[in-house]
Amino acid sequence: SHMEIKVNFLDKLRLEAKFDDFTVIADQPIRYKGDGSAPGPFDYFLASSALCAAYFVKLYCETRNIPTDNIRLSQNNIVDPENRYQQIFKIQVELPVDISAKDRQGMLRSIDRCTVKKVVQAGPEFVIEEVENLDADAQALLTHNAATNAFTFIAGKDLPLEQTIAN
């Protein structure tokens, strides 16, 4: 299932992402010349894996009628001082004493199935390109218009995707 997110440039460094019926606002902290009026894009990225983990715990509990009132979940990202793109996402869950060992294991295993985590671990490929018309291009994407002769450049690779496959 594919989702298009359209971004609008607002005042100063504020941005607005629109998808489905939702709008998300991002800003930058004051130290980065923003107003600090909203989380930054990377903050949303970090929040997405914590929320995904909690969602999978919630699903596990719902199907087994386990109350989530006293379950607490937290995520910390530990950044490698040598390489800030090398990070450990540590997800910690605090569970009430009355939860069985079986359910404790089950909850940890369900967090492991989190979609955000799985996509990040698989290492998504980013295709960055200019288009003449976003709306027309989105339409072509939906109808899988394979009749285009456009070359798709993947950042970090020299040859267009089509030629890389051909080689």
Language-model features: locations:
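Extended beta-strand/beta-hairpin segments
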Residues: 2-47, 58-167
